[in-house]
Amino acid sequence: SDAHSLFHYFLTGIISSNGKQFRIPPHEWGLVVIFQNYLKNLQTIWDSSELQKAIQLKIQDDNVECDIQVKKLPDFQKDIFHSIISGKTSPEVKKLAQTILRNEQESFINLSPKYWAKDISEKVFILHGLNDSMVPFTESIQLAGYLPNTELCVSCLLEHKEISLNGGFFFNFKELFKLLQFHAKLFSHYEN
């Protein structure tokens, strides 16, 4: 729910909650989204337009054209591209991302609920997967803390776009019950 914590997660895979640290390998699309949206604003001593084009082709799932575009890039830009696309941050990508974070501070303040969520008076229901690698669960915990009227459910059964049933029968049953309670509150709220 704020740019600093998300950038830290995308660059390290480490998240913190209640004084504990967790390591969840970040989904590669986190870096892709950052560079897709902000690389064009970054002043570099090299032209980033061809790298931007390669990233855009990857997003469009045009793998043939993307491969052709990547082959045209200078070696250091190929390394940057592969680091971004793989989600494994090289020192250069880390440096670029940190520069983006500094340069885009105003934009990130406008996007970060940390600065405006307190103004939302309606009840907000947040459901998040504990092992979501796109956006870590700690962001939902922070968001729930910023909102004045919220119901939060973090479930071990949910991952990004997937359901995980790796916990054993009783654990899964307990998690399903927690999800049912959350949904009951949600439906009850909107029935009234």
Locations of the language-model features?
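Alpha/beta-hydrolase-fold enzymes
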Residues: S1-K78
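Flexible internal linker/loop segments at domain or repeat junctions
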Residues: I68-E104
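Active-site nucleophile elbow and catalytic-triad environment of alpha/beta-hydrolase enzymes
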Residues: T99-W116
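Conserved alpha/beta-hydrolase "acid-adjacent" motif
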Residues: F108-I109, S133-E139
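Short beta-strand/loop motif that positions the catalytic acidic residue
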Residues: D119-I120, I126-H128, D132
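Short alpha-helix in the alpha/beta-hydrolase fold that links the catalytic acid
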Residues: E122, P136-G145
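Catalytic histidine neighborhood in serine/cysteine hydrolases
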Residues: L147-L165
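Catalytic active-site module of serine/aspartate enzymes centered on a nucleophile-bearing elbow/loop
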Residues: I163-N192
